[in-house]
Regions:
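Hydrophobic alpha-helical context, especially transmembrane and signal-peptide helices
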Residues: 4-5, 107
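Alpha-helical interaction segments
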Residues: 7-8, 110
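Generic, low-specificity signal for short hydrophobic/alpha-helical stretches with a mild N-terminal bias
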Residues: 8, 59, 101-105
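Flexible, processing/modification-adjacent segments and terminal tails
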Residues: 81-137
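Short intrinsically disordered, low-complexity coil segments enriched in acidic
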Residues: 1-4, 137
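N-terminal mature ectodomain segment of secretory-pathway/periplasmic proteins
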Residues: 3, 10-88, 93
């Protein structure tokens, strides 16, 4: 591991501490022009996201005004009611973005995929740099 990466990992609590935990939850206030442009204004305005630490998964709750939640993993995303009943799901969600432009609206499962993927990445940094296959040069 490079000295700089080692320093950054230690500044984030260290690998030993990180490995003692399986998940992390964060309360969020999310805004910006993108959500309205994509037809999903306010869906994630105030939410709690929980992400797996290491294993790639995430969940936002509430998702919209009726206390639904999302379940994100790389090859599946679902929208569930508060009791866990699947209301809508998308298998291989990344492929559903083929041909999209900046103006293309997103479906709710696409929003759940985008938000889950982004938050899992953000909240697992800098530890993602330690994953097998990552070049530290």
């Amino acid at each position: 591991m490079l000295d700089t990466l080692r320093h950054v990992i230690e500044a984030h609590g260290g690998l030993e501490n990180w490995n003692q935990h399986k998940a992390l939850s964060v309360d969020l206030v999310v805004g910006g022009m993108l959500w309205g442009l994509k037809g999903q204004f306010g869906k994630l305005e105030r939410t709690t996201v929980t992400v797996g630490l290491g294993k790639e998964w995430a969940s936002h709750q509430p998702f919209g005004p009726d206390n639904r939640r999302t379940r994100f993993s790389p090859d599946r995303v679902a929208i569930e009611d508060a009791q866990g009943k699947v209301l809508e799901e998308l298998i291989e969600p990344r492929a559903s973005f083929a041909g999209h432009t900046l103006e293309t609206p997103r479906t709710e499962p696409q929003l759940a995929y985008f938000a889950g993927y982004a938050m899992w990445t953000y909240l697992n940094l800098p530890f993602l740099a330690l994953h097998e296959g990552v070049d530290h040069r």
